[in-house]
From Swiss-Prot:
Function as written in the Swiss-Prot or TrEMBL entry: Modulates the antiapoptotic activity of the viral protein BHRF1. May also play an active part in oncogenesis in Burkitt's lymphomy and nasopharyngeal carcinoma.
GO biological process: negative regulation of apoptotic process; symbiont-mediated suppression of host apoptosis
Organism annotation: Epstein-Barr virus (strain B95-8)
Any Gene Ontology CC annotation: host cell cytoplasm
Record-linked Pfam families: BALF1
Keywords annotated in UniProt: Apoptosis, Early protein, Host cytoplasm, Host-virus interaction, Modulation of host cell apoptosis by virus, Oncogene
Record note on quaternary structure: Interacts with BHRF1; this interaction modulates BHRF1 activity. Interacts with host BAX and BAK1.
Family indicated by similarity: Belongs to the Epstein-Barr virus BALF1 family.
Protein name: Apoptosis regulator BALF1
Main location group: host cell
Subcellular location: Host cytoplasm
């Protein structure tokens, strides 16, 4: 598979490298403010801008693109777990965030051991490549789709906490890269289920109903 990504970093000596599938995605690590209202897809007919604390993802696709939507929701959920801040999460991201937290509580020791084994191994490119290798190994095992996805999301969050607890820009880079990779890797599956929100409703109907009720009550 032809892989490409460009890194425009303010840190001297940090070279460009290749990790993500084409079409070309440009990631710019520039310091920005953190107003919640900027973290939403742009209303553009030819591109989707999903803003993160590092001014991250720019993809040449329409606003209703399921890959971009899935990438956005997975990033928001993982970053909320990382920062312990669920404020203003879209409902699908909130449900996924709660599921990640529940899985982390259940298998805390397993994920912690995995993250500790891979600490201090190199730069961001090495970290992302390692997580992708874990993702491929999990997908080769005999799990259902959501079990695989849950393992990778949980491992990525723990990995970010272990290596980037005091560096939110780097953490957002890793979380966002994996979210984008997951969305692209499973794009046909997400599209068949109608995107992340519908797939969450199908896989976790009780959880979704409770989250919807909670969200409704908070809005009263």
């Amino acid at each position: 598979m032809n892989l490409a990504i460009a890194l425009d970093s303010p840190h001297p000596g940090l070279a460009s490298y290749t990790i993500l599938p084409r079409p070309f995605y440009h990631i710019s690590l520039k310091p920005v403010s953190w107003p919640d209202e900027t973290m939403r897809p742009a209303k553009s007919t030819d591109s989707v801008f999903v803003r993160t604390p590092v001014e991250a993802w720019v993809a040449p696709s329409p606003p209703d693109d399921k890959v971009a939507e899935s990438s956005y929701l997975m990033f928001r959920a993982m970053y909320a777990v990382f920062t312990r801040d669920e404020k203003d999460l879209p409902l699908p991201a909130l449900v996924l965030c709660r599921l990640i937290k529940a899985s982390l509580r259940k298998d805390r020791k397993l994920y912690a051991e995995l993250a500790c084994r891979t600490a201090d191994i190199g730069g961001k490119d090495t970290h992302v490549r390692l997580i992708i290798s874990v993702l491929r190994a999990v997908y080769n095992d005999h799990y259902d789709y959501w079990s695989r996805l849950r393992v990778v999301l949980c491992y990525t969050v723990v990995f970010a906490v272990r290596n980037y607890l005091d560096d939110h820009k780097s953490a957002a880079f890793v979380l966002g890269a994996i979210a984008h990779y997951l969305a692209l890797y499973r794009r046909l599956w997400f599209a068949r289920l109608g995107g992340m929100p519908r797939s969450l409703r199908r896989q976790f109907p009780v959880t979704w109903a409770l989250a919807s009720l909670t969200d409704f009550l908070k809005s009263l």
